[in-house]
Design a protein with these regions (language model features):
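Terminal-proximal interaction/regulatory segments of ATP-powered molecular machines
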Residues: 1-96, 105-134
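Short beta-strand elements
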Residues: 101-103
């Protein structure tokens, strides 16, 4: 949880180390486990995901969940006979696979839960995101 988005590939690497340790058994298992520990201890750190999910859960617990925008609901008739899923913009049909569209309920449409951390990976992601939004 401390490494997070600063080095997201660490999840797969540590899992591979644990799987390898399970297959090897002791005493050899200590090597991949030590490698995983050193990798995590020396990796850059980020708590941006923890902060974001914490803020999102706080809103849910405060009753700020609202209803999904109708364009994101499945296309079918709802209980009132109105069609749902209308006017959905398929992001992959747009340049850079992105289109401006409301994804959160009206009450939360301007809330930003994820904030990029100050590390190489997240700075690059932020730059990419700003570039594709134009």
């Amino acid at each position: 949880e401390d490494v997070g988005m600063a080095y997201p590939q660490a999840i797969a690497i540590v899992k591979a180390c644990v799987d390898t340790a399970m297959q090897l058994g002791l005493p050899e298992a200590q090597l991949p486990l030590a490698q995983a520990a050193v990798l995590l201890a020396t990796a850059p750190k980020s708590n941006s995901v923890i902060e974001g999910i914490g803020a999102a859960w706080a809103d849910v617990k405060a009753g700020k969940s609202g209803n999904f925008p109708r364009c994101l609901q499945n296309v079918h008739a709802d209980s009132t006979g109105g069609a749902q899923g209308q006017n959905y913009k398929y992001p992959h049909a747009y340049p850079n696979h992105w289109v401006k569209q409301q994804y959160l309920p009206d009450e939360l449409k301007n809330v930003q839960y994820y904030r990029y951390g100050d590390n190489k990976v997240e700075r690059a992601a932020a730059q990419y995101w700003e570039a594709i939004k134009g």
